[in-house]
Amino acid sequence: MNSRVFHEGYDVIVCGAGHAGCEAALAAARMGASTLLLTGNLDTIAQMSCNPAIGGQAKGQIVREIDALGGEMAINTDCTAIQFRLLNESKGLSVQSPRAQCDKKAYQFRLKHSLELQPNLLPFQATVTGLIFEGARVVGVRTNLDLEFRGRTVIVTTGTFLRGLMHIGQNKNEGGRLGDFSAKTLSASFLEAGIELQRLKTGTPPRLLGRSLDFTKMTEQKGDKEVTRFAFHDTRDVEPLFHVEQTGEQRLGWAADSNQISCWMTYTTERTAELVRANLHRSAMYSGEIEGIGPRYCPSIEDKFVRFADKPRHLLFLEPEGRSTNEYYVNGLSTSLPFEIQREMVHSVPGLENAVLLRPAYAVEYDFAPPTQLFPSLESKKVENLFFAGQINGTSGYEEAACQGLLAGVNAANKARGAAPLIIGRHEGYTGVLVDDLVTKGTTEPYRMFTSRAEHRLLFNHGSAEFRLAHHARTHGLLTPSRLARIEDKRTAVLKWVAFFENSRIEGGRGTWGDAIRRATTGNAAPVQYPSEFLILSQAIQEEVIYRISYAGYLAREERQIAKLAQIEKIKIPQYIDYKSVRGLRRESAIKLDIVKPQTLGQASRISGVNPSDISLLMIVISATRA
C-alpha cells in the first residue's frame, strides 16, 4: 500500500468547509456514509465571509427548505441570531421572508461543534491540492500534507478559493478571503479532467469600530417583537457552546426574553459620489485589473454611482457582527478602491465622520465551473462520482451554497451506496428552481435567488416547506421518524381546518368561514373572529390554514399548471442521442442541447434558445427510439 494513503475507505470526501461543505458533510454522515471533511483551517469552518446575516427575500424560504430536508443552517441561525425580522410583513404570505442577523463567531463555533459531534464524520485540517482519477472516475484527493485520501465520491465546495485573487486598488494578494490562502493547484486537476473553468468576482465592504460611530445621525432598525424562527421544530438546548467559565453563551445563543441588537441606516452623500467618480480609474473593477464578472444584484459602490447615476444617494446599513465584538459591517459599501479612498468615502457618510476602519473592503476574483457541466444531482457529467456545490457552481450567497451542499451530500451518499439521487423539481421549492436554472441555463455572473425566478412561487410560502419536501426526506432518510410523524400531524390539522372553514357557514354571517377569510385578506371586511379551538393551535398551523384559504383559487390554478407540465417532465431523453444528426433541428439548438445534455424533455424545453418546434422534433426522435 502507498505509504502516503491515509485512508482508503471513505464513502464521501468533502473539499471545503464553508456553508456548502458543512451541509454536504452533515447530510452524508447523517445518512450513514463515512465522511471526511477537509478544510485548510478548522478555525474558519462556516465563516461568514461577507455580511453576518442569514435569510432575506427567497433566501429565507431556502433556509426553511434546508431545515425540511434535515439540514443545519436553520437551527444554527436560530441558536446564534442577535436580531430577527420578517421581510415584506405588510405583503402577502407568499413573499414574506424571515431574516436574521447572526453572531458571526457564535454561528461559526456552534456549527464547528455540531460537525465534531456528528457520528460518521471526521473534520480534518488539510488543503486539497489535487484530485486522483482512475479513467473517467474520481477516486480520491491529494493534500498539502503529502497525504492522499481515497473515497467513493468527492464533493468540491471550494467557494472563492480556487485561484482566488484579492484586489484593493492596484494592490493584489492571492487568497479567497482576507487572511486566508487561495487553492492554487486544484484548478489544474479540473482542467486535466476536461472540466471548463471561468472567472467570477465578488466583493465585501469595510468593517468599522462601533464605538467610533455616531448612531444619533442614523435611523435605528430594531428586530421584530414577535420572532419568526427558521427551524420548524424547537431547537433549544443548554449544552455549553464555549467550555470556559468566562462566558455564559449556550448552544442556544438566544432566548425569547433576551435583547436583540439593532441595525442602523444611513445614506451616502454627494461627497461620496464625488470621491467614487474621481477615483474610478483606481478601482480594480474599472481599471481592467479584474477579469471576472461581479454580482448584478449586490453591486459595488462604484457600480451604483455609474449604473444608477441619476440617484443622488444610496442606502447603507450598519450591521453588528456579534454580541462579543464591537465590529460593524457596512452593508451597501462594497468596493475595490484603494484604502485611502475607502477611508475618505466612509468619512463622507452621516454618522461615520470619525469612523475607524478595522478591515478594508476588497474584491476577490476566483475560478468557477460553469454548472451546465453537471447533472441535476450536481454530479459532473465528465467525471463520475465528482460533485460540485456552492460558489464553484457560480452562485452567490450562504443560503444558495448551503442548499446545494445538502443536495450534493445526499446524492454523493446515495451514489456511494448505489441508490437513486434526490432531485427536487421546480414545482417543489426554490432549491429545485436554483439547481434547474444552474444545470439547464447556466450562469455568466454570480447567481442569486429571487422569488421572481420561480414560476410557482405562490406555492413556496416559507411555512409550507415541510409539507412540500417531507416525501423526499422520508425517501432518503433525512429526518427522524418522530419528526416525520409531527409533520404528518401538522398536515392533518391543516387539512382538517381548511375543510372546516371552506364547508362551514358562519352563524348569522354571509357565506362560509372561507369566504370571510378571503374578504378579510383583501381588506374588504373586518378581521375574522376565529373559533377558540383554532386559536389554540400553533401559529405555524394557523398561518398555513389561512394562507391556503386566502389564495385557494390561485393555488388551484398553479396545481393545474404543474399537472400539465408533469407530462413533459416525465419523458426521459436517451443520453446517447446525437443532436447534431437530428434532421430539422436548428444548429444553435443542437449545440446547446449537446452542452446541457438534458435528462427530460421538460428540462430541454427550458434551455435558452430551444424553441417548441425543437421539442416537437425531439418527441418524434424519442418515440422512434422506443419503437
Q: Over which residues does each language-model region extend?
A:
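Beta1/beta-strand and adjacent pyrophosphate-binding region of the FAD-binding site
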Residues: 6-20
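Core beta-strand elements of the Rossmann-like FAD/NAD(P) dinucleotide-binding domain
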Residues: 8, 144-153
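Conserved N-terminal/central alpha/beta ligand/cofactor-binding core
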Residues: 26-133, 145, 157-177, 181, ...
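An anion/pyrophosphate-binding glycine-rich loop and adjacent beta-alpha core
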Residues: 41, 188-343, 440-510
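Glycine-/small-residue-rich beta->alpha transition segments that form the dinucleotide
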Residues: 153, 158-162, 337, 350
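A glycine-rich dinucleotide-binding beta-alpha-beta segment and adjacent secondary-structure elements
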Residues: 302, 317, 323, 329-393, ...
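Internal hydrophobic alpha-helix adjacent to the cofactor/substrate pocket in enzyme cavities
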Residues: 401-422
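Extended, charge-enriched "interface" segments that sit outside catalytic cores
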Residues: 453, 459-461, 465, 470-626
